[in-house]
């Protein structure tokens, strides 16, 4: 996690603009309306691309093992792409996105194994996130939650971090489908579709 130390006295752990902006004396305003609109658009795009990819693959494809992640199949990677946004969204209710929250979600979703079930789950996640981001619920957006990714962050900041995280894993799935399964998807997300979503330069 990032750590900011101010005047050798104040320590701020995590990506926490609500504390960092006043502590550093920054004269900036956070545009929540613009932020939520952009996040909603990109989540609809990213989750939609994930759903389309799942729909084109056979059961054999979905259960192929990944060479870079022991004990994971392509199905597991796709469920990771979809479940982390759900966890980030749900943090506005449960108050965290912890490793235990992640393990509980894995247990809850362990029987979601077929493409239709995965697609139905993804569509539900997309709808919940879209409705939340369009709700103008500033109190929920600004709720500070402890998260495995980012430290102490607001729910809106967590959704932004997880958008990047899931998009990076979607790109890994695209690579696997192309290079290992030798399947050409008919309508993958383009670079333009994902423009503005920051992901690591290294794919793995």
Stretches with model-predicted labels:
Residues 1-2, 58-59, 200:
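Short, proline-centered helix/strand-breaking motifs
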Residues 3-30:
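Non-catalytic, surface beta->alpha helical segment in thiol-disulfide oxidoreductase systems
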Residues 21-35, 39-41, 45-67, 77-81, ...:
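Non-globular targeting/processing and membrane-anchoring segments
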Residues 27, 54, 61, 96, ...:
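A general structural signal marking secondary-structure boundaries and capping sites
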Residues 36, 42-56, 107-146, 153-172:
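Acidic/histidine-rich alpha-helical segments that form the ligand environment
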Residues 61-107, 144-204:
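Short, contiguous alpha-helical
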């Amino acid at each position: 996690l990032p750590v900011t130390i101010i005047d050798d006295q104040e320590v701020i752990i995590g990506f926490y603009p609500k504390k960092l902006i006043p502590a550093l004396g920054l004269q900036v305003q956070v545009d929540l309306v613009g932020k939520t609109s952009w996040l909603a658009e990109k989540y609809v795009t990213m989750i939609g691309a994930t759903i389309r990819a799942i729909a084109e693959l056979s059961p054999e494809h979905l259960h192929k093992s990944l060479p870079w992640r022991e004990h994971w199949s392509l199905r597991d990677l796709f469920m990771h792409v979809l479940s982390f946004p759900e966890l980030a969204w749900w943090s506005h209710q449960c108050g965290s996105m912890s490793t235990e929250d992640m393990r509980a979600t894995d247990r809850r979703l362990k029987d979601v194994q077929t493409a239709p079930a995965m697609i139905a789950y993804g569509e539900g996640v997309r709808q919940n996130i879209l409705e939340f981001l369009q709700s103008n619920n500033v109190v929920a957006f600004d709720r500070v939650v402890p998260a495995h990714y980012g430290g102490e962050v607001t729910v809106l900041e967590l959704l932004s971090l997880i958008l990047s995280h899931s998009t990076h894993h979607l790109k890994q799935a695209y690579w696997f489908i192309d290079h290992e399964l030798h399947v050409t998807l008919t309508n993958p997300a383009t670079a333009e579709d994902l423009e503005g979503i920051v992901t690591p330069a290294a794919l793995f």
